[in-house]
Amino acid sequence: ATDAIASSAVTTTVLAVNPVPWARAQMAFTLAFHIILVPLGVSWAFMTLIANYRAVKHGDRDALMLAQRWSKYMAVTFAVGAVTGTVLSFEFGLLWPRFMGQWGAAFGVPFAFEGLFFFTEAIFVAIYIFGWRRLRPWPHFWTGVPVVLAGIGGSVSVVAANAWMNAPSGFTQNAEGTVVAVDPLRVIFNDAMPLQAAHMVVAAYLVVNVIVIGYELFELWRQPAVIAAWKNAVFAAHGGSPMMVLK
């Protein structure tokens, strides 16, 4: 009991002295986990849609099977990414109340747009997943387009918030330093946003292409006669090569 009391006292003392390192550690842990899922969630949708297009346009059954398989990965990464993203949204207010109190009116603008993109993506992910055998091929394909666009829009919105901290703009402060007027377009399209957003989107697509190529080559190493693995690897390479050049 004495040891427990002593340990509790030490913990309380450390937190009372400086809570900032603990807040940083907690947010770093959440971000480190979330950022792994973001490229997957953004890119799987695009890869799935391209495979789906090939299946509908050319009647490629291998592409259809690939799209159906990838759509499951897309749904899982979206769901888990949504959970970690929700945790992050709470952490901004709980861990950094002074920052949000002073700058939240401007900093929150990109997150408002991210929320709109998120709900759009959530709606159409559900329609796309459950529409495989319930919708005709072309209408089903078009339900995947909003998923891709919303995924890109959401990631760009979050990157815009980060870019705004690097190049603040689009706001007016009063004598106390509180933000009293905001120009949403200037906040989102700040000077640092274009380069950071392009970097993030290209990196997201490149990550998924590399993962797919690596997995399919591993399958070919195990079973060289599997034609579908060859097609999938070539398919991913075609998508990844331009991204590598852009990167």
Question: What would you call each of these model-derived segments?
Answer:
Residues 2-247:
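Polytopic transmembrane helical bundles with strong interfacial aromatic enrichment
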